[in-house]
Structure formats: C-alpha cells, structure tokens
Amino acid sequence: MNRLSLLPPGLYRICPRLPRRPARRAGRWASKLHSSVALILLATALPVEADVADTVAKVKPAVVGVGTFQPTGRPRANLLGTGFAVLDGRHVVSCAHIFAKPLDTEKKAVHAVFIGRDRQMAVRSARLVATDSARDLALLRIDGAPLPTLKLGDSARAREGWQLYFTGYPIGSILGLNASTHRAGLAAIVPIFTPMQSADQLNARTLKQARDAYEVFELDAIAYPGNSGSPVWHPETGEVLGVLNSVYVKGAKEAALSTPSGISYAIPVSYVHALLKRAALDAAEPNASEPNASE
C-alpha cells in the first residue's frame, strides 16, 4: 500500500512527492492526528448524551400516571394519561380533558394517581383542586408521602429550534405503567386557533376562539393517547417548559395511532404558573438565567 494514501486528502494534495522518510513521518503524524480528533469528538459527544441520561433519571420519579380507580370495577385501575408532581410533592399537574368524563359513583370510582411500575404500582386517590379548561390544564392534590418534584421553568424564554424532551405513558392502557422519554424539536410557537376553511364556518363560537387564541408550542414529535399531561422539559436543567396536550391528526381520530402526523402540541408552563397562583399556591420561581439551546 502506498503510505501516502494514509494521509487525509488535503495533506495528500499539498505534498504529493514527499521523500520516503518524511512521508513515513507524515503518515505517523496523520495517524496521531486522526486518533486525537476522534478522541476529542468522543469526549465532546459523550457528555451531552450522559447529561440527558442523567436528566431523564431525575425527571422520571416525578412523572406519574393519572386516571380513575374503582374498587368494584373491571379493570379497577384505568390509566388515562400522564401527570407530574410539583411544589410540595402532593400536587400533580396534568390535562383537564383527562378528567372531563364524570366519575361512576355507583362503582365508587375516584380520580387516581399511579406511581411506580406495573407490578410495583401504587395507587393514590386524588382530587381536582383547580382546572383551566381553556388551556386544558388540571391540578390534583394527593395525600400521603410527598413525591419527587419537577421545577417549573420560564416558557417565555423558549426558542424555536430548541431540542426538548417529554416523559409520559403512551398508550398506557395497553403498554402499562412504564414511562418512556422522547425527544421533541420546538418547531414553532403558534396560536392555538385553527383557521377556518370557509366563511360559512365563522360563528360566535369560532370568533370567540380566534379572539381568545393563545400561543402554544408546536413540537416535531410523535405522541400517542396517554401522553397527555406529559412534562416537556429542557435536557440541561430538567425544568418543565410545557405540558403536552394534543396532536395533529390527519383524517379520523383513529389515525392518531395508525398514521401519526409527527406534530404535537404543548401548553406553555406559564399557564401552569397562573393556575397555581389562582389556586393560592406558590410556584417555584423560574430560573433567572436563560439555558443554552440544545442543538
């Protein structure tokens, strides 16, 4: 083998006729250079992944399943979505639409929070203490020992292009209480109002929706039923920036499972701060320093 071929193309072009001895030295130098570059790239890449893994390990204990529990029903536990503990560890944030259906009082059904994993699952009864139907947010209170908590960040500092993550229970009724974490690119910050296809669709209700429209996070991520209420968090700090609540569906509702669009939406955590304030609870102060965007 021609030893000159071991040189990177740029070096090969500027010294095509090196004498034999210098060529050997150049080859050894290039080999060492390649090794050094590889080590540098490895050293800079690994900590990023390690940091995310460390953050996942800190986030997951605060993420819970939410739904209903009925002692005389089958099944007794009905996992409907995701939530996460905040403040004193006895308050859980989730989505309001999860609790829209009235409880079956004949079967003594109660709102519930599910902790742990499948066979080690523990059930805590919960009660709704505040809701914001317009922003699809709910706050529950549980009794017993406090849970690990997540810190609420400042969603006003979120920027399009950030790489975020969310943790929850996709299709939890089938896959069980096993939290999974997914990456989500913050594709856009958009009004939640859906434009009408024709003037015939304009009425008092749609006009009010347009007037009251607020901005949400559009995420480049696939989410499934059960992910509603998942915290959307920053990989460096673990701070919650949003609450996953919906997906864009192409066609019928069933398409959310069969042909997911890859477009999901999250409610900015600023509305969680407002909900806690309205419930006379003190939320954690947002971090004063702006986190760096993760590429």
Give residue spans per PLM region.
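Catalytic-histidine neighborhood of serine endopeptidases
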Residues: 87-133
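Beta-strand/loop subdomains of soluble extracytoplasmic proteins
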Residues: 109-112, 117-126, 160-165, 179-200
